[in-house]
């Protein structure tokens, strides 16, 4: 959130910003209306806060529901088993549009090791689509990063995160 708030005023206004990291509820007010898509909604409480802030600004906020497909304790995201229920609950919020799912697969040496996870989330996306839930559009399947994006695309990814491949390793130390 801080990075968006710092860089957005300095860069061209036609850039379409996405919120891709973990989002805390107390930071929601700073990004609603400033980003095209929030990739990391994994609780109803977070979605509810996004909806509250979106109503205040009279905007609709597109989101992706983050699924922890590999059940990794170190990562955020709802379990695949609970994802459909969460999608159904969030779908009732007036100022949110569920545009799809996002997952971050485990870091592996061999990208093939993540194929099963990518298949599982693709199937979850199909299952949600087949439920025909109002206000839910499974248009985006965001999965795959620099090391495994080719396998993710083969398994149905419509969006990949390849920043390291383009920009190199990030330095997260504050200067």
Which residues does each predicted region cover?
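Active-site-proximal glycine-rich helix-loop-beta segment
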Residues: 156-158, 163
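Short glycine-rich donor-binding/catalytic loop of glycosyltransferases
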Residues: 164, 171
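Conserved alpha/beta-domain cores
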Residues: 1-147, 153-155, 167
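Active-site loop ensemble at the mouth of alpha/beta enzyme cores that anchors a bound cofactor
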Residues: 173-175
């Amino acid at each position: 959130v801080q990075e968006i708030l710092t860089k957005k005023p300095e860069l061209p206004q036609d850039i379409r910003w996405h919120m891709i990291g973990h989002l805390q509820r107390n930071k929601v007010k700073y990004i609603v209306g400033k980003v095209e898509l929030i990739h990391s909604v994994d609780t109803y409480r977070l979605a509810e806060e996004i909806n509250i802030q979106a109503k205040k600004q009279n905007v609709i906020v597109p989101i992706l529901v983050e699924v922890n497909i590999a059940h990794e304790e170190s990562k955020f995201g709802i379990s695949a088993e609970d994802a459909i229920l969460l999608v159904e609950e969030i779908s009732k919020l007036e100022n949110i549009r569920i545009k799809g799912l996002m997952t971050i697969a485990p870091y592996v040496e061999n990208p093939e090791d993540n194929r099963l996870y990518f298949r599982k989330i693709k199937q979850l996306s199909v299952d949600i689509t087949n439920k025909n839930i109002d206000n839910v559009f499974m248009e985006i399947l965001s999965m795959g990063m620099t090391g495994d994006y080719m396998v993710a695309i083969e398994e149905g990814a419509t969006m990949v995160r390849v920043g390291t491949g383009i920009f190199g390793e990030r330095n997260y130390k504050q200067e």
